[in-house]
A protein has these predicted regions:
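Charged, low-complexity, helix-prone segments enriched in Lys/Glu/Asp/Gln
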Residues: 1, 17-18
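Divalent metal-dependent hydrolysis catalytic cores, especially in the metallo-beta-lactamase
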Residues: 2-13
Length: 234
């Protein structure tokens, strides 16, 4: 419909669970991880360049402003590589945590749900899957990494930390951060119920803004510019 070139790889994070666990294993072997009652975390103090990419002032950071507070974390901005399923709960997507990834107390980890034979069930942290898939498909150093500007201080910062800590080389040569698309002057948000999909734009009364509005106004704009889209009320 839009004349866009499809990606060479259409991947799912769940297809890369063994590789994600292997990345956690590498980070553990290199001394970058530690374990709490709810998961395995990346120790950002072991990665001196952690704040450089987003020019973060870590001394002024408050845990709640960027990440969920966890009193067991060594630094508020340390992030989960692998989370343990909560006791008494079962997730739609969870996997066995390999015993060699656990600390010496292993299966006695408090606060973690156990499966058959006391195996601790878990799931990947938010950032782990992206680094894993990128390095598996594109190599340890990729040419261009894109994403939204809102990912700079947390997601992309954490991707860089875990990827470069594991590989020892630069993760991405260039970063292209896209600005936000706004609708009628406001942000697009699930909570506001104002989201529009491409399918919405292709159907019904929105066709009149599709060709000129979407292609010229969105797809052909400078990637770092904020774009506004007005939706007809009829």
């Amino acid at each position: 419909e839009f004349g866009l070139t499809p990606p060479e790889h259409m991947v799912r994070a769940t297809d890369f669970i063994p590789q994600q666990l292997a990345l956690v294993r590498t980070l553990k072997e290199k001394g970058y991880t530690y374990q709490t009652s709810d998961g395995i975390y990346f120790d950002t103090s072991k990665f001196p360049r952690y704040a450089d990419f987003a020019q973060l002032d870590l001394a002024a950071q408050k845990a709640g402003a960027r990440v969920e507070a966890n009193s067991e974390k060594r630094q508020p901005w340390d992030f989960a590589l692998w989370k343990f399923t909560e006791p008494g709960k079962r997730r739609d997507m969870e996997w066995e945590t390999p015993e060699d990834l656990l600390d010496s107390h292993g299966r006695e980890t408090p606060g973690a749900a156990s499966g058959a034979a006391g195996v601790i069930m878990g799931f990947p942290g938010w950032h782990l899957e992206c680094s894993t898939m990128a390095m598996e498909l594109l190599g340890q150093t990729i040419d261009i990494h894109t994403g939204g500007i809102d990912h700079i201080p947390v997601h992309h910062t954490n991707e860089i930390a875990q990827s470069e800590a594991a590989s020892g080389v630069q993760f991405a040569r260039y970063w292209l951060h896209c600005n936000h698309l706004k609708i009628d002057g406001g942000k697009i948000s699930k909570s506001l119920g104002n989201g529009l999909s491409v399918l919405d734009l292709l159907q019904g009364t929105l066709n009149d803004i599709l060709d000129a509005g979407l292609q010229a106004g969105v797809l052909h704009r400078i990637y770092e510019a904020q774009v506004g889209l007005s939706v007809p009320s009829h």
